[in-house]
Amino acid sequence: MAPRDAWLARWLPLIGERAAGLPVFELGCGGGRDSEVLAAAGHQVVGVDLSGKAIANARGRVPSATFHCQDIRAPFPVERAGVVIASLSLHYFPWPETEALADRIRQLLLPSGVLLCRLNSTNDRHFGASGHPRIDDDYYMVDGEPKRFFDRAATQRLFARDWRALSLDERVIDRYDQPKCVWETVLERAD
């Protein structure tokens, strides 16, 4: 049986090309679902997540990886990366903080490095894109947590400076009990 939400499979050749012998750095690694895929493909992985419980689960799931319990806005535990993964982890912050985080990721990457990123879509009706208290445009308080939702223009605006989009698609993923709509983008550092 294929794993649910096997989104990284199609990107493994690119990840292999761009990792440049460095660990793949995963922002918001959760319980290690994507870290496990990366490690199984032969990559060293360094992951960070705010949840101590998620980090404990990730360590149990992928003992070969290195995990840090920290806010993704804190200083990164790696100095350089060829590949950064940020799946559903960049949408919790006010717009200026999100932009600053995208810039820090770009600075972390090698000149040929890539970011594989998934963001909540404004079409993600099952997971908070409507019916919640508004904080700002497309930014809501959902079950006690701020969540930002992106359309194509917002995704492009976030990565407009010194990034080259290799792929940008709105997708429905099979990760939870309900279908979830996300923007999946693969970006190359372009400065």
Language model features with spans:
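Class I (Rossmann-like) S-adenosyl-L-methionine-dependent methyltransferase catalytic domain
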Residues: 1-25, 30-77, 100, 114-191
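A conserved beta-strand element that flanks and buttresses the S-adenosyl-L-methionine
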Residues: 85
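A short glycine-rich, Lys/Arg-flanked "PGG" loop and its adjoining helix->strand segment in the class I
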Residues: 99-111
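Short, conserved catalytic or interaction motifs in soluble domains
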Residues: 95
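Short catalytic micro-motifs in class I SAM-dependent methyltransferases
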Residues: 88-92
